[in-house]
Amino acid sequence: KIKFSAGDTLYVCGDILDKGEQSARLLKLLMNSDGVRCVLGNHEYAFLTYYWSMMRRSPKNFDEVLESLRSWFAPYDGSPLDWDTMDKLEALPLYIEEEQFVCVHAGLPLDEDMRTVAPQSVMPGMPGMLLEDRSFMRPQVVPLNSKCVCFGHTPVRYVSDRDEILAYRRLGRSGGSIDDYYKIHLDTGVYLSGVLGCFCIDDCRARYVKRRI
């Protein structure tokens, strides 16, 4: 078991929405839980784009906007959103950078020398570089100068045919520290596979919870 406790921090690399029958409920849980830090995924960004268009069309009827947002979700989701949750979702960053690692949805852009481009230098008008790119997940992509990059976006099964976290170790490293890895592909495709994965940065071990069929 993952055994997440009050003393832990949980990092979620996006794609909270559109990944199951109760994604609105999941969004509210994560946005309002202590010790949880999330970044935007492409699905959240698409939802926010829809939300912003609704706000432009109905600037004086905010209740109507909230009601209209329900149409985004499955009719059986049964968990209408509130303004506090929407404000927190809108404030999510495109990436989180810590001392030893970076959390981002799809990966970091690379220059022609395979060196990572600092995420803060990505133009604000081009979030797709951090949200949509599918090249960073390729095993042959080895960033040369980066902290460990934790990312998701595409289920690992499309790389390895397995529903498990892929941690790419630096040459000659033991694997006991997060510094020993240059990237960690986290997406176990829980909606497709029923396998929820979590990588613990303290001991660099992956843990899984599997849905009972």
Task: Enumerate the language-model features and the residues they cover.
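Conserved beta-sheet core of the metallophosphoesterase superfamily
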Residues: 135-211
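Active-site neighborhood of divalent metal-dependent phosphoester bond hydrolases
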Residues: 6-7, 20-99, 109-110, 116-119, ...
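Divalent metal-coordination and catalytic microenvironments
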Residues: 15, 30, 41-42, 89, ...
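Short, well-ordered beta-to-alpha junction loops that form the rim of enzyme active sites
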Residues: 99-109, 152-155
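Short, well-ordered beta-strand micro-motif
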Residues: 97, 103-105, 198-202
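Short acidic, Gly/Ser-rich segments with clustered Asp/Glu that frequently serve as metal-coordination loops
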Residues: 17-24, 191-193
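Residue-level marker for buried hydrophobic side chains located in beta-strands
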Residues: 10-12, 38-39, 102, 150, ...
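Short, glycine/acidic-enriched loop or turn micro-motifs at the edges of active sites
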Residues: 18, 45, 108, 156, ...
